[in-house]
């Protein structure tokens, strides 16, 4: 087997060897381009009773009300997010070419940025990186978003997004926003409350 591989490389031209090396490096770079832990942020200390009612909370060390990450997303919030933010969430692989094409057309037509075309996966990457919005950064977000789709399930990506999305002031994440604005847990949000929170990060 080893001799066959060696003979294969011997018969390749220099150009093909260089090209194969570049492709190999790109594939390896893509595999390892995403950090094992996306978010490196402090979280609030939260105390709840056995029924999940909030008894108290302590602000995170960076001055943000950021409750610990969620493992699931309430159904109403999930549906509102997909309706308002990313209708093709369950059908794309991190990047939605149709949304990007539509956003590009709208931006050119209006001669200013009116739409970003980002999927929820791309927005999750943006929240994790917290970099300036530039064309180069958008390309990086697209690459990392496709990589995240290979690593995590759609539900895990949604949970990452709702746990770290900004909801105004120093309120970060769905749980902190739900208690801050409505005085109850995210599981008890009404449709109207869910719709409001779904569009608030924008």
Where are these regions (language model features)?
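Juxtamembrane regions of bacterial inner-membrane/periplasmic proteins
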Residues: 1-202
């Amino acid at each position: 087997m080893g001799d066959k591989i060696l003979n294969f490389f011997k018969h390749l031209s220099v150009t093909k060897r260089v090209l194969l090396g570049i492709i190999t490096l790109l594939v390896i770079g893509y595999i390892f381009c995403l950090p094992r832990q996306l978010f490196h942020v402090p979280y609030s200390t939260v105390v709840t009773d056995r029924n999940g009612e909030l008894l108290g909370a302590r602000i995170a060390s960076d001055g943000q009300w950021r409750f610990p990450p969620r493992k699931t997303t309430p159904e109403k919030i999930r549906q509102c997010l997909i309706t308002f933010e990313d209708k093709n969430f369950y059908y794309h692989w991190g990047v939605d070419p149709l949304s990007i094409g539509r956003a590009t057309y709208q931006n050119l037509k209006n001669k200013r940025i009116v739409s970003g075309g980002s999927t929820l996966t791309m927005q999750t990457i943006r929240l994790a990186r917290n970099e300036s919005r530039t064309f180069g950064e958008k390309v990086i977000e697209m690459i990392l978003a496709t990589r995240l789709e290979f690593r995590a399930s759609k539900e895990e990506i949604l949970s990452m997004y709702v746990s770290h999305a900004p909801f105004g002031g120093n309120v970060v994440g769905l749980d902190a926003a739900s208690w801050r604005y409505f005085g109850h847990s995210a599981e008890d949000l009404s449709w109207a409350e869910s719709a409001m929170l779904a569009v608030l990060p924008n």
